[in-house]
Amino acid sequence: MSDEFSLADALPEHSPAKTSAVSNTKPGQPPQGWPGSSPWNNPSAPPSVPSGLPPSATPSTVPFGPAPTGMYPSVPPTGPPPGPPAPFPPSGPSCPPPGGPYPAPTVPGPGPTGPYPTPNMPFPELPRPYGAPTDPAAAGPLGPWGSMSSGPWAPGMGGQYPTPNMPYPSPGPYPAPPPPQAPGAAPPVPWGTVPPGAWGPPAPYPAPTGSYPTPGLYPTPSNPFQVPSGPSGAPPMPGGPHSYH
């Protein structure tokens, strides 16, 4: 008895698996249960290519562009570009320093045009104290009190204030004031004379030409919005008094 054990020895003589294996096998043809040439049973066979792309096509020549890479290919990349982060804040001053002293202007500005022309109207005279001479050359020496002369006063010499153009009232005797009147008495009339005759209007007022109507009850004018009374069977008007039976 042999020590080797085979599957064919364990199956019964009339087993369907054993019968099909024997009956369906033909010389030079592989069994139908196994596929043909594949990388597993034929290492020298070329790998199968998907039917979507030709064998000569490369990812760069695909009309949709190269295949995306990364953890999530469908999401576009966001954020700062790859590389070391920029220093914050940036080094250096916030504004550039000035470039140095500015050069002098090449075109000088307009200078003085010379003496100014004589004005076409005289300047207004400055106010001077009262009594001062109009000509400054004729003014005498000033004393400690401004325009007052330090010397004695001449008879016709003007003082600090001008001579008034209207004489002062004379200090002669004035008429005595009237004596005080008793309360309730009419004061005397100091002007004119009182005309003779009675005081009052020249004639009495004329009487009225007609008498006014006696006040009394007047008829009420007709109301254009008054609703005429209807027959007894007519319905009451809206808003009017209602009779409850």
From Swiss-Prot:
Family: Belongs to the MISS family.
InterPro entries (UniProt xref): MISS
Residue list for modification N-acetylserine: 2
Biased composition (Polar residues): 17-26
Compositional bias segments (type: Low complexity): 34-43
Residues bearing PTM Phosphoserine: 2, 6, 15
Protein name: MAPK-interacting and spindle-stabilizing protein-like
Chain residue ranges for the region called Disordered: 1-245
UniProt feature, compositional bias: Pro residues: 44-57, 74-127, 164-190, 198-207
Secretion signal span: none
Recorded superkingdom: Eukaryota
Alphabetized UniProt keyword annotations: Acetylation, Phosphoprotein
UniProt cross-references to Pfam families, sorted A to Z: MISS
